[in-house]
Curated annotation (Swiss-Prot):
Keywords: Cell membrane, Glycoprotein, Ion transport, Membrane, Potassium, Potassium transport, Transmembrane, Transmembrane helix, Transport. It is a multi-pass membrane protein. Residues 316-325 have a biased composition (Low complexity). The chain crosses the membrane at residues 28-48, 84-104, 494-514, 571-591, 625-645, 684-704, 756-776, 787-807. Belongs to the TrkH potassium transport family. It comes from Schizosaccharomyces pombe (strain 972 / ATCC 24843) (Fission yeast). InterPro entries: Cat_transpt, K/Na_transp_Trk1/HKT1, Trk1_fungi, TrkH_K-transport. This is Potassium transport protein 2. Together with TRK1, defines the major, high-affinity potassium influx transport system. Involved in maintenance of the proper sodium/potassium ratio in the cell and in regulating the plasma membrane potential. Residues 165-177 have a biased composition (Basic and acidic residues). The lineage of its organism: Eukaryota, Fungi, Dikarya, Ascomycota, Taphrinomycotina. Pfam families: TrkH. The gene is trk2. GO terms for molecular function: high-affinity potassium ion transmembrane transporter activity. Glycans are attached at residues 9, 239, 283, 293-294, 321, 443, 460.
């Protein structure tokens, strides 16, 4: 929970000099923010009247630090002052502060990497069109010519072809009447003019092969069914998308089919010297050849092949999954099947029909060559041969040096799983074209729950502890910044929705409760409080852990109201201690349920794998589980002590067992953060008071230790560089040295705890000492038995732990209300100091702005830990 120092590049307004000279401490900005908000809130409260300034200052500090110690009864101030306290408390919560930091970081990323972010937006827009769902409507016409697209028909998916409707059959019969006596070859020549370069020397002529393949003996081997075309040569096109642009309208319908295969008997050979006599020069055939810059054309590139029987021309690729066929006969040719199919009788029937003089409107068939079922995925996974080796230290994202690592490749040129495009109409080609590089190798990351595969980066990056990326070139850092920017955008949306959802849910639930519960509603109205305002104030105070209540006895009046205690417990946990756990759980759910776009999934998974690069309160998996176990044990221990140590207590025994259990659960949740009470703490067992005092002091420890343990720059401030859990290939550390890592890690944690104690104890007891001096006379007086050393120590620890519990004083909500002015000033100082004890000892990577100085720090830390020289490369090395 912090707002640390930040820096930008040298040209920014907040440059490195400002960070090093003015913001020389990591909590400088946080202190300035909280102190400024406290002073501003106190001025507003004091200006509204009915308050002394010292009380206004104490109320403001309690609101901005989420302490909640009340110097006055809130029912004695105006609603405007109550609203001011509530708003300043909401704006100062850890969630809001870190949300503001995320927005601030987004601004600087946008400023420094504007071109990279713009390209990412264009790529996301492009990807949306290329990978859109198949159920979106396709173009219905090219000019005035109808289009019909049938994907994955016939034998490839082992599904029968959908029968034609009555309207389609009537249309086919009408076409047969008009075109029955026309010549097939003349009709073929008039339909679509072939590109000029097919007949010229603009592209090298390659031998053509059979146009249609089928699987007969082996699924992995295919053979040609039609004879070669002699001198008619077709150009080889590698990994391209060919789009046919037809500029004029035609009256003949155009149908697009994807047949599985064709029988050999249905093909005839076009004469070698055949040349169409009628050409429509308005029809242009354009080839859009999309090739990657850094990829080379293989000599084994797929070729375009043609085969004709006088009625059809087939353009296919030997390695491609698609072929384009000109069809002038019955459309049922799309349903032809190989010999081992269940539809052999359909193939025989259609073969006989092909020799008849039944001619219908011209049609274009886009036919994929048969591919075995186990080879149909466009991306194949290859197990890493070295993935089983347990390496130590910084790992590489190419799957070669990672434990449980695998890699998958997208290879649009040479592999059997490619999806290269053949000649397509313009409206279809723009949906299928792809801007992927010729070969991309990505990392396949495994988690304990399941295996998910998403691309990270297009280069091999060295990653150390706490997601620190080392030895990156400027170009590679820009690519990394683009992914980080997208992850920050997603995180911002998650935080806003999370924050608003629980506020609205709490408000609606408490409104329903307070207007339907007769006893509880009467308690609120008897205190002169509006029910609707009570619901809004209480729900927000619970989720934001303010600890303020409009009732003078906190929530003691609702001791037997189950619903507000259950909902209040949930809001307290999710608004503070369990927030990091819930945030990671939400991201985990989104990864498995959302399917927006590949870029969205990539950024979301990057946020899941490298949380501490983006957000202070988002931790890796292991740290999150440790935090969950610690919080569970602490809450169970507090609940156990309340139930056991209060046995025989006259005050607690009066509470029925069922309500007592619910009171123990709620009080346990409020003791470590919120500061609400449902029982009178001054009447419970002394041992339970000591337990609560201990819980208030260590309230910040679980999250603070998680932050510091996962901070990249923490080791720099401590001078202790913990070894990586997994070292890279260059470290050459054997497995025997792994035993030495455990003591180092224990020393690392123990050093944190010792520094935290030295940070807390002297300040805490100094404040306690000053208050005992100021309140000495009252401590000695027998007329005020509630003024005791233990009560003051309880109040001091409650203020320093920003909890807000108090043993009370007669009719006042807290003992602080009876302190003198100097003692109240000490309490303000304790609250502000305690608000920052969750800060790390050094700048946090999650709040640092991108700058060359911060990049140099990462390289320096890498060299200190591994004893390596700077390995920055001049140019990025594309993976292959």
């Amino acid at each position: 929970m912090q707002l640390s120092g930040f820096s930008t590049n040298g040209s920014g307004s907040l440059n490195t000099i400002v960070c090093e000279k003015l913001l020389f401490k990591p909590n400088f900005v946080q202190d300035s923010f909280i102190i400024g908000m406290t002073i501003l809130c106190s001025v507003i409260l004091y200006g509204s009247g009915n308050l002394r300034y010292i009380d206004a200052l104490l109320l403001a500090s309690g609101s901005c630090t989420q302490t909640g110690l009340q110097p006055v009864d809130l029912t004695q101030i105006s609603i405007y002052q109550q609203l001011t306290i509530l708003l300043f408390g909401v704006l100062s919560t850890p969630i809001t502060v870190n949300l503001g930091l995320t927005l601030f970081k987004l601004y600087f990323y946008n400023k420094r990497y504007d071109m990279v972010i713009t390209n990412n937006k264009l790529r996301m827009t492009y990807t949306y069109h290329t990978v859109r769902r198949r159920d979106t409507p396709e173009p219905s016409k090219v000019g005035n010519r109808k289009i019909r697209v049938l994907l994955d028909q016939g034998n490839q998916m082992h599904r029968p072809v959908a029968p034609e409707t009555k309207a389609e059959e009537a249309e086919h019969q009408e076409n047969e009447k008009h075109h029955r006596h026309h010549f097939r070859l003349r009709k073929f020549a008039n339909a679509i003019d072939r590109p000029s370069f097919f007949r010229g020397n603009t592209m090298p002529a390659l031998p053509s092969y059979a146009g249609v393949r089928n699987s007969q003996e082996n699924e992995d081997r295919t053979e040609a069914l039609s004879p070669a075309l002699g001198k008619r040569r077709m150009a080889s096109i590698d990994n391209g998308s060919l789009s046919v642009v037809q500029n004029n309208a035609r009256n003949n319908p155009v149908d697009f089919y994807i047949p599985s295969s064709f029988e050999e008997s249905s093909f005839q050979t076009i004469p070698e010297d055949f040349e169409p006599q009628v050409h429509d020069h308005e029809n242009q055939t354009q080839l859009n050849h999309h090739l990657d810059n850094n990829s080379s054309i293989s000599s084994h590139n797929p070729s375009l092949e043609t085969a004709n029987d006088g009625n059809q021309e087939t353009v296919s690729s030997s390695n491609s999954n698609y072929s384009t066929t000109r069809v002038d006969n019955d459309p049922h040719v799309a349903s032809y099947s190989p010999q081992n199919s269940n539809f052999d009788h359909q193939a025989a029937a259609t073969t006989n029909d092909a020799h008849q003089n039944v001619v219908r409107g011209s049609a274009i068939t886009i036919a994929p060559t048969p591919v075995p079922r186990h080879n149909r995925r466009p991306i194949y996974f290859a197990d890493d041969t070295n993935g089983a080796e347990q390496e130590k230290g910084a790992h590489r994202l190419d799957g070669r040096g990672r434990k449980r690592g695998k890699s998958f490749a997208v290879t649009p040129t040479l592999h059997r799983n490619e999806r290269s495009m053949s000649v397509l109409p313009f409206q279809l080609a723009k949906s299928f074209t792809s801007a992927l590089p010729r070969r991309l190798t990505f990392n396949r990351t495994h988690t304990k729950a399941s295996t998910m595969s998403l691309p990270y980066l297009s280069y091999n990056a060295t990653v150390g502890r706490n997601s620190a990326f080392y030895a990156l070139t400027p170009v590679e850092r820009e690519e990394l910044a683009g992914i980080e920017y997208e992850s920050l955008r997603i995180l911002t949306v998650i935080l806003v929705v999370y924050f608003l959802f629980w506020h609205i849910l709490g408000l609606v639930a408490f409104l329903i409760f307070i207007y339907t519960a007769k006893t509880s509603g009467r308690v609120v109205t008897d205190g002169g409080i509006n029910r609707g305002w009570w619901a809004a104030f209480t729900s927000s105070s619970l989720f934001d852990n303010l600890g303020y209540s409009l009732n003078s006895d906190s929530l003691n009046s609702f001791q037997k109201a189950i619903f507000p205690q259950v909902l209040g417990t949930i809001l307290i946990f999710l608004g503070n201690t369990f927030f990091p756990i819930m945030l990671r759980f939400i991201i985990w759910i989104m990864i498995r349920t959302t399917r927006f776009s590949p870029n969205f999934q990539q950024a979301l998974y990057f946020l899941f794998e490298h949380p501490r690069r983006s957000f202070t309160l988002l931790f890796p998996s292991k740290t999150t589980w440790v935090l969950f176990l610690n919080l569970t044990l602490l809450n169970f221990a507090s609940f156990f002590f309340f139930m056991v140590l209060d046995l025989g207590n006259s005050y607690v025994d009066k509470i029925p067992v069922g309500y007592r259990i619910m009171n123990a659960i709620f009080q346990n949740a409020a003791t470590r953060s919120a500061g609400f009470t449902v029982v009178d703490l001054s009447q419970i067992a002394p041992a339970v008071m000591v337990t609560y005092m201990f819980m208030m002091y260590i309230s910040a420890y679980p999250i603070a230790m998680s932050i510091r343990q996962t901070n990249v720059y923490e080791e720099r401030s401590l001078g202790i560089y913990a070894a990586d859990t997994e070292n890279d290939d260059d470290n050459n550390i054997n497995n025997n040295n792994n035993d030495n890592n455990t003591p180092k890690r224990k020393n690392f944690l123990m050093d944190h705890i010792q520094r935290q104690l030295s940070h807390d104890l002297w300040y805490l007891f100094l404040g306690y000492f000053i208050i005992t001096i100021v309140e000495g006379r009252r401590l000695e007086s027998e007329a005020e038995p509630q003024f005791t050393l233990f009560a003051i120590l309880f109040e001091v620890i409650s203020g320093y732990g920003t909890v807000g519990l108090s043993l009370g004083y007669k009719n006042d909500p807290s003992l602080t209300a009876q302190f003198r002015k100097i003692s109240k000033l000490v309490m303000v100082a304790l609250q502000i100091r305690g608000r920052h004890r969750g800060l790390p000892s050094a700048l946090d990577r999650a709040v640092l702005m991108p700058s060359d100085k911060n990049f140099d720090r990462e390289e320096e830390d890498y060299m200190r830990r591994h004893g390596k020289k700077n390995t920055n490369r001049a140019d990025p090395v594309p993976s292959s």
